[in-house]
């Protein structure tokens, strides 16, 4: 079921210059983005459902204002999906733009310099939850559509698929895609939800990692106990959970889960050579993160560890007393949330099962261990010999003045593999964020330079892609 919004005529601005139009209107572009960022569209929180609807409606409104001839909000059992399109000629190529308006929780709030949903501009950067992931990035495409429509230069048909559940695994997007294949018919999918190496060194992600995610619960006594009366006689769930987690890596930071690496498609020597040529300032990297040394799987560089290698990370661990001051208890339960980033040809379901089996097999006497599955997604690689990739590379070279370097992204976009399977479409990633933009962390940010440069670059992609015979 969907709710359709009436379209309105677009007043074409008498200007044939993309750059001139952008310069004239970029202050408004920014204000419209800030309005979007003020909406706390946190998909993981059920109490935020009204905000999700509000955000979807604003996205719909902006797409219509940008020149879309059709924009609809589709209801799902979860959060709404926004679809829009501008069809200029069915014979011309069609680009499907994917993005998401939902954001990660902002916790811990006390670590934000300014409130996460009260966006502020400091040092040429937008600080707000969702500034880069992904409101700031998908909104570049909305403004690029406006520029091309207003100047009468739109060279392709454009469709938009903007969802509200990416941060929780795109739970209902698969059903929508399967039920609306004709609606989503296109020639390529364009996504801006990834990063560049730096503002000085543009790059294009040629792949993203997959994801497996579980929650582990270790249960001991039927209540929290006095650590003096019972300590040493009763198994401590927190201590045992810590030991289990520590056993997941060996002394070389190699993951020890049986069969974990069985299906890993190793990167070619040629790809590793190209990655080695990408600039990397180790001192600046450590300074930005406030760490004294790098860490990771032995035998691989930082770029390789965060792109072509699978990982296992603890995302949260808790149990017992964690409030202010002290309380000497032996906790009844301990918990951990643990995720793995996956590389081709690992399968999310297989790795999830391996994680669950590993933790349950390690349950020592005195406690019980349960592990439950959360969302996941498959890894994805995109070809670099396609017309779409070359169009993206040419567009970035046009505006940045240098050729982009192909790299693999460390994050996950769970829906990518499904797009290719159900729609038969390849994906091109044109991300303009930076790894230092604090995605999923306090003080998320997005450089104004990147925001405006993205808006400037995207029309060139459409121009070059339209040259497809």
What is the predicted function of each stretch?
Residues 1-10:
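N-terminal amphipathic/hydrophobic targeting modules at extreme N-termini
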């Amino acid at each position: 079921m969907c709710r359709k919004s009436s379209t309105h005529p677009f007043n074409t601005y008498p200007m044939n210059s993309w750059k001139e139009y952008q310069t004239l209107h970029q202050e408004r572009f920014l204000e419209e983005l800030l309005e979007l960022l003020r909406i706390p569209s946190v998909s993981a929180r059920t109490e935020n459902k009204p905000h999700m609807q509000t955000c979807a409606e604003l996205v719909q409104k902006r797409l219509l204002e940008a020149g879309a001839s059709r924009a609809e909000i589709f209801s799902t059992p979860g959060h709404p999906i926004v679809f829009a399109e501008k069809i200029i000629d069915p014979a011309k190529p069609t680009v499907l733009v994917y993005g998401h308006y939902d954001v990660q929780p902002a916790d811990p709030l006390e670590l934000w310099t300014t409130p996460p949903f009260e966006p502020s501009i400091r040092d040429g950067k937008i600080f707000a939850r969702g500034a880069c992931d992904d409101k700031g990035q998908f909104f570049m495409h909305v403004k690029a559509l406006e520029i091309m429509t207003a100047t009468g230069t739109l060279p392709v048909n454009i469709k938009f698929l903007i969802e509200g559940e990416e941060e929780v695994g795109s739970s209902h997007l698969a059903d929508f895609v399967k039920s609306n294949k004709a609606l989503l018919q296109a020639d390529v999918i364009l996504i801006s939800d990834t990063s560049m190496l730096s503002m000085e060194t543009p790059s294009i992600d040629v792949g993203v990692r997959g994801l497996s995610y579980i929650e582990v619960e270790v249960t001991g006594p039927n209540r929290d106990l006095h650590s003096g009366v019972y300590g040493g006689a009763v198994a401590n769930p927190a201590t045992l959970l810590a030991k289990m987690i520590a056993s997941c890596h060996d002394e070389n930071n190699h993951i020890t889960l049986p069969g974990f690496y069985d299906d890993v498609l190793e990167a070619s020597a040629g790809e590793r050579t190209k990655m080695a040529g990408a600039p990397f300032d180790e001192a600046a990297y450590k300074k930005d993160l406030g760490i004294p040394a790098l860490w990771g799987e032995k035998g691989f560089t930082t770029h390789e560890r965060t792109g072509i290698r699978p990982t296992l990370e603890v995302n949260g661990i808790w149990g017992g007393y964690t409030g202010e001051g002290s309380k000497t208890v032996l906790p009844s339960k301990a918990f951990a949330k643990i995720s793995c980033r996956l590389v081709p040809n690992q399968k999310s379901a297989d790795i999830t099962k391996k994680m669950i089996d590993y933790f349950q097999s390690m349950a020592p006497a005195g406690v019980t261990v349960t592990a439950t599955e959360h969302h996941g997604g498959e890894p994805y690689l995109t070809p670099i010999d396609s017309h779409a990739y070359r169009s993206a590379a040419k567009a970035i070279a046009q505006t940045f003045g240098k050729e982009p370097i192909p790299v693999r992204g460390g994050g996950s976009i769970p829906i990518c593999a499904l797009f290719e399977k159900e729609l038969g479409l390849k994906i091109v990633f044109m991300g303009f964020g930076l790894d230092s933009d604090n995605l999923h962390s306090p003080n998320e940010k997005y450089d104004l330079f990147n925001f405006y440069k993205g808006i400037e670059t995207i029309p060139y992609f459409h121009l070059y892609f339209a040259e497809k015979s």
